[in-house]
Amino acid sequence: MNIKSLLLGSAAALVAASGAQAADAIVAPEPEAVEYVRVCDAYGAGYFYIPGTETCLRVHGYVRYDVKGGDDVYSGTDRNGWDKSARFALRVSTGSETELGTLKTFTELRFNYAANNSGVDGKYGNETSSGTVMEFAYIQLGGLRVGIDESEFHTFTGYLGDVINDDVISAGSYRTGKISYTFTGGNGFSAVIALEQGGDNDGGYTGTTNYHIDGYMPDVVGGLKYAGGWGSIAGVVAYDSVIEEWAAKVRGDVNITDQFSVWLQGAYSSAATPNQNYGQWGGDWAVWGGAKFIATEKATFNLQAAHDDWGKTAVTANVAYELVPGFTVAPEVSYTKFGGEWKNTVAEDNAWGGIVRFQRSF
């Protein structure tokens, strides 16, 4: 055997070994295709599909800063300086289609801070104290809704006007645990029935009273509504199981033009006291009314007036101006006259107050 034979033999052995190793080598799998977030437009703007599911998700909310001066138009006291408050509201909405209808959820977490003219951390208006609160958390399947929401006594008729100090004359408690069902017809007709836990620290008179049910019997709310291009008319009746009394409201909205609309609401309670869950105005009855005028694409004027049986009168006007899309500045002026039986509850009969709200919605 010569040198040439050895070299040829070694080369052949190396080629054979390489072939054997190649046969045993691990082949890397093909990379999986990246699944980009898909837009979901079935439930409105801002939704996207959660990757790997058919559930649509939206993250939204607002950041708000309020500056108040003058009198407190709810209590009639002089602020003697500026009151400031801030809020960050984080909202999460989901939606998907099922064999039983559309399945939705909605949650809202509020981070609040408030300070009076001395910079002392304190209570903001008729809302929650400074801190964090789960304001909404409910599940909805078709017309069925369960969880923490606002009372149908408020929501079904459309709240009050588009002003900040809208409930100086209270129209009932807001947040509550509830089970409700809303039927929506194809001809503008709708109806609702709700079993509610009762108001959460929303006492209209004292601002501190809880109106939760104290047994197994829930509060009951029922309502009917008809809506068309001209406007709408709605009525609700509520039974307060704690005091065993009832209250009712009827509201009508009329669209005069595409830019100008008016509304009027009347209410009656079988118990002439604001210390209850629903009829929190003074006396047997109360009335609210208002108007909205869309002056330009950026500016909207709002006006609301209210009066109750005990002699309180409240008037508020503002202009909401959208500086840029998503950022609105709203200066507002309010006046309250504490007449009749309300005179003994306040230090001053007349209260003038102002507020400027800065809000970025997203």
UniProtKB/Swiss-Prot annotation:
Its main location: membrane. It comes from the Bacteria. Keywords: Cell outer membrane, Ion transport, Membrane, Porin, Signal, Transmembrane, Transmembrane beta strand, Transport. Residues 1-22 form the signal peptide. Disulfide bonds: none annotated. InterPro entries: Porin_alphabac. This is Porin Omp2b. It is a multi-pass membrane protein. Consists of 16-stranded beta-barrel sheets, with large surface-exposed loops, that form a transmembrane pore at the center of each barrel. The pore is partially ocluded by a peptide loop that folds into the pore lumen. It comes from Brucella neotomae.
